[in-house]
Structures are given as C-alpha cells and as structure tokens.
Amino acid sequence: MKKMLTLFTAFCLLAVLLPALQSGAAAAPQAKLAVYVDKDNHSFIPLRFLNGFAGIQSVLTASGGQIQMSRGGNSITFTPGKPGASVNGKPVSNNMRPFSENGTTYVPLSLVSQTLGIQLQWNKEAGSLTLTSGADTGTAVTATLPVQNGTLIKSSSPAVVSGHHTYRVGGRSFSVQTVTVSLLHPSVKLDAVLAGNTVGKTEALASIAKRSNAAAAINGTFFNAYTDGAFKTPYGYIISGGKMLKNSSGDKRTVFAYDSNLLAELIPGSEFKARFDAGSVHGALQAGPRLLVNGKVALNVAAEGFKDPKILTGGGSRSALGITRDHKLILLTSGGATIPQLAQIMKQAGAYQAMNLDGGASSGLYYNGKYLTTPGRLISNALVVQTK
C-alpha cells in the first residue's frame, strides 16, 4: 500500500511539473529561420522551414534516429550527425552531416533542393537566398531567407551592444553614439511603435521604449512637430506586426522594412506598397533620404521628394540606421552633420545600406534604460529593439 501511495505521489508531481517544464522549453527563443553557410562553404537549411514549404513533408522521428522528407513522389532520408543519405530508398553520397543548434535542426541544402525540386537564387548584396518551387507548373511558391555565414549565433552571445565613436569626415571630427543589433540573434525582435499607440500623438522616446520593454530605441519618421494642434501628423509608412498603421501612398522616400525573420532592407518608397501587398513585410518605417547603397554613398535627395533646406544643405542633429553585410542593424546619432557627411559617417560605422531618420530636436537614442542621445522634444513614433 505504501509503495502504491509513493507511486501515486510521484505521478501527481510529474503531472504538475511536466507542463511547467514544457512551458519553460517553449519559452526559450528559437533560432531565426536562416540558411547557414559554414567555413567550408557548405550550405544548410532549417528543417523547421522546409516542413510545409511547397508541400514538403518533413519528419524528425521520435527517437531522433532519422530525418525524413518527401514531396511529389520523391523522398530523402538523413541520419542526424552522420554523412550519407537515402534518396527514394537508394543510398547516395553526401559528406555534409545534419546537425542541431539553438533548438533547430539543419539539413544539407544542395541535396534537399536537387531531390525535392527547389530552385535557388543567391542574393549577394542582400545576404539572402530565394527558394522557389513549382515555377514550371505555374503554381510557384517562393520564400526568401537570410544567409548566415561562418558560425551560427549562440543564444548566449550579446544581442545588443552600444558604442561611442569618433569619425573624421572632410577634416572634421564627429562624435557619434551607436547601438548595434544582431538581427539574427534568437532573442531579438523589432517593432515600429506609435506614440500613445495612436497616429497623431507624441510621447517621450524613453516612455515609448520602457512601455515596449525595449533594450534599445531610436526616433522614427518625420512628423508635423510645429503645428499648434494636438494632432501631429506622422509622415510616411508605418508598419507593425504586418499591419499598416499609417499609409503614405505615392511617397517616394526610402523605407526601412523587415520580415518575420528580421531580414531587413531599404526599399524605395515608390516600390513599397507592392511589397507590402505581397505579404512579406512584418514591420517598416519611412524616412530617408537613402545614404548608402551596397557600401557606396548614394544620395538622390531631390528624387525622394525632399525640399527642406535642413535636408538639402543644412547641418544639425542626425539620426540614422544602417544594415551591415552580416545582418546587423546600426542605430546612430550624431550632431552637426550634413546629409553627405552623415552618409560618410554611416559608411565608416560599417553600414552597407543606410538611410537618414527624422533629426533635429527629434534625434534620440535609448539603450539599457537610459538615453545615449536625449531628444529635445516629444516624438511621433520609434523603432524599438526587444530581447525576449
């Protein structure tokens, strides 16, 4: 009888603890869905992405003994941690071993794409890979994933770091504050947040950051800061969680946009609406002008529709963001720079793509609970960085 009670007690404890353990495991951040290219130039793709893409069925057996995938009558089987594979039941040569990291299983991309009929387009400048299936049947399914080179980002590595730098441009020194965000870090999220969660309101940058549980934040789009009215119109597209908070049809200014994997890019304003309608944009802010294209200064301020002398010729407090080739986001503030000088600063800071944000008294940068650059007024919206 005593033994039965002990077993019953143990069962009850297990019933209580197991959901909690499962909940804790579920709460751990998963790796972003990204193609991984190792130091030997071998490419791997997350099994989690493949499952369901273009009708692919993928299974990691309960014992972890085999990885099985199938599509359109073709099948492929891997053994985790071991070379070799089986295609349609026949052994094939394969030197790349499936592996798991950060809770994600990766499988060799080349053999999977060849066997299951997936076309690959490597986008060097964007650091991404576009996968297409079914193009020959008129039912094409397409997805684009970031490409991570060298080593996978560990969840224990820093996700967001700050810095203070001095850059020389044209014989003049500029002191800048930066926050660098590892976009492919498992814990990182971005969001575009409205002041007061309402179009037309204003709020302190620190207040927006704190109520968003943000590790970092920078001011966002231009807005009508000088009206006497309570409603201060933001200018440009604002997208959050895939929803359009502020439309700006016809606006040609540059848009910073990112998808659900935080694959970030800068898009001309004239092209943005079509991209948003395609369903790939998870978040976005429109400001401009564009500063860098593929690592080179590329200013076309008038073509983006700017007429204000503060942008065309003047200097002042500046905010900007940049994207590096290895999927880092640079948030930067500087004082007294013209737009051409800001472009040079962003290049020296390591950005490959870059654009200007609202500046002047709006310019502000927040990190780790305090201001690195304090804005001189309330702002309309902000780009915030969250770590789960």
Model features per residue range: what roles?
Residues 28-65, 91-128:
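Extracytoplasmic Gram-positive cell-surface binding/anchoring modules and repeats
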